[in-house]
Structures are given as structure tokens and as C-alpha cells.
A protein has these predicted regions:
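Membrane-interacting alpha-helical segments
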Residues: 1-7
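Alpha-helix initiation and N-capping motif
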Residues: 34, 44, 63-67
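Amphipathic alpha-helical interaction segments
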Residues: 29-33, 48, 77, 81
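N-terminal acidic leader/helix
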Residues: 7-36
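Amphipathic, hydrophobic secondary-structure cores in small proteins
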Residues: 35-58
Length: 85
């Protein structure tokens, strides 16, 4: 009976939830809106090029470590593209 009310999330949904949590954590760390961080990440391709492909490794790390990694990658990718945050 307990299983009747359960729902299942596929891997794509899990990765998207994880990416969303990364956006939120970075926004909280730098003190700006999630919308602004999402736009910055999207502009440099960080979600599709770093967070989603790195899910298998990243999701096993601490929230602090993931946040630092993602923020560091964002700053490096912006710098490489000549974008000033």
C-alpha cells in the first residue's frame, strides 16, 4: 500500500534538480539573485558544459565543495570569454 503514493524521478530530472540547486547555492554565496546567476551560467554554457556532464562526480561531494567548484568554474569561463561579471 505504501508504494501506491510514491513517484519516481528519472536521471534527467535528477540532474536538472541538481543544476538548479547549484544555481541557488552560488547565488546565495555571492549574494545575488538566482536569475542573475542562471543568466551568467547560461551565457557561458556552464550548466550544459560543466554541471550536467559533471553530475556523477559533483553530486557525491559536499555542498560547500560543489558551490566553490561551480563558482570557480563560472569565473574562469567568464574570464576566458572576456565577460566581466
Amino acid at each position: 500500500m505504501a508504494c501506491e503514493n510514491r513517484f519516481f524521478i528519472n536521471m534527467e530530472e535528477l540532474r536538472n534538480i541538481f543544476a538548479s540547486s547549484c544555481v541557488e547555492a552560488v547565488a546565495r554565496k555571492v549574494g545575488c539573485s538566482t536569475g542573475e546567476i542562471y543568466r551568467r551560467m547560461k551565457r557561458v554554457g556552464l550548466i550544459a558544459g560543466f554541471i550536467l556532464p559533471g553530475y556523477e562526480v559533483l553530486h557525491t561531494q559536499s555542498r560547500e565543495h560543489v558551490t566553490e567548484d561551480v563558482l570557480g568554474a563560472l569565473l574562469i569561463w567568464e574570464r576566458k570569454m572576456g565577460i566581466m561579471a
